A protein has these predicted regions:
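Long, contiguous domain-sized segments
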Residues: 1-58, 63, 117-119, 125-151, ...
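Two-metal-ion RNase H-like nuclease active-site motif
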Residues: 63-73
Length: 328
């Protein structure tokens, strides 16, 4: 057991009490009342069945499924003395021995002019998000051109590609639509507030805060139940259709996005996600978990790569702190 000081214990107790006070209405809310609200105001709650082996066979006959994910890691200290590696991976269920990797390396020191020492952290995040989104979209594009799959499942909401990598995203979207390839996004960490926004308008349900969908739907759906959203949302305005799904024994839900032009396949894709997700797992399709594990860039990997291919003098002068030298 860790030896915690009393001040730290007190801070944790304070946070606990603060959060209990904030979420007391939600924790005591009648889930049946919330379900009755969701059906007419948000979308139909529907119980779905996992696909049979016979149903799954059709995906092998029609090109299989491609899973896409990305990863990033960095070595170094404060701006501009750091280096980042981005890696994207697209992997076909039919040709697992032919992974499609894409990679990008970035450091502010590579710029021709002296980098801005006071670089805004918000701008850095925008750049980082774009680099990661670009590399994932590039991997997806390469995979659909090589494998011609039935569907592509991206790890995360596909709206983020429209935001962070608009030009490449439009290329991927257009190519999928032209080739009839279904494009899907699966999100574990839901950040939307679709239900919360509608609840605040409802006079018959007293709720003091605008809770997020992740919070409101915790324990609300049964395993295999999905909510097919039929109200206007930011995702719909971006040309997407969405559903919430409880895909495992865990009481949390995930979100499934699809292009609006392919909305007739939404229920099929939600069922596919349900089928590919272990009932006792973390809620996302096993194939995405496999891709996630293979694309990850560990601390030891980035250090090994830089030690092998970067001049040792540059590595130590630019990217290794005195503290880090103890582990290099």
């Amino acid at each position: 057991m860790f030896n915690l000081n009393e001040e730290l214990k007190g801070e944790i107790r304070h946070i606990n009490n603060t959060l209990l006070d904030k979420y007391k209405e939600l924790l005591s809310m009648d889930k049946n009342l919330l379900r009755k609200f969701i059906d007419p105001h948000i979308g139909k709650i529907k119980k779905l069945a996992r696909m049979s082996p016979e149903e799954l066979k059709k995906y092998a006959q029609l090109g299989g499924i491609v899973g896409v994910d990305g990863s990033k890691n960095r070595l170094g200290g404060a701006y501009p003395h750091f280096i980042e590696i981005y890696q994207g991976l697209a992997k076909s269920t039919l040709q697992a021995d032919k992974p499609v990797f894409k990679a990008k390396i970035y450091t502010p020191l590579q710029m021709e002019e002296n980098p801005n020492i006071l670089e805004d952290s918000k701008e850095e995040k925008i750049r980082s998000d774009k680099n990661l989104a670009d590399i994932e979209v590039e991997a997806a594009l390469a995979a659909i051109r090589e494998f011609d799959p039935y569907a592509v499942i991206m790890d995360g909401s596909i709206i983020r590609y429209d935001i962070a990598s608009a030009e490449r995203w439009m290329e991927l979207k257009t190519e999928c639509e032209e080739k009839g390839i279904i494009l899907v996004g699966v999100t574990k960490d839901i950040k939307t507030s679709i239900i919360g926004e509608e609840l605040k308008k409802e006079k018959n349900i007293s709720i003091g805060h605008e809770f997020r969908d992740r919070e409101l739907l915790y324990g609300t759906l049964e395993y295999g139940e999905a909510i097919f959203i039929n109200i206007k949302t930011k995702k719909e305005l971006a040309g997407l259709e969405s559903a919430f799904l409880r895909s495992s024994d865990s009481p949390t839900v995930i979100a499934v996005d699809i292009l609006e032009s392919q909305k007739e396949y939404l229920e099929e894709m939600v069922r596919l996600v349900l089928t590919l997700t272990p009932k006792n797992g973390r809620g996302v399709p096993l194939w995405i978990d496999i891709v996630d594990s293979e694309v990850k860039i560990s601390d030891s990997m980035i250090r090994s790569l830089l030690e092998s291919y970067l001049d040792r003098r540059l590595l130590e002068m630019l990217f290794i702190s005195e503290r880090d030298k103890r582990t290099i």
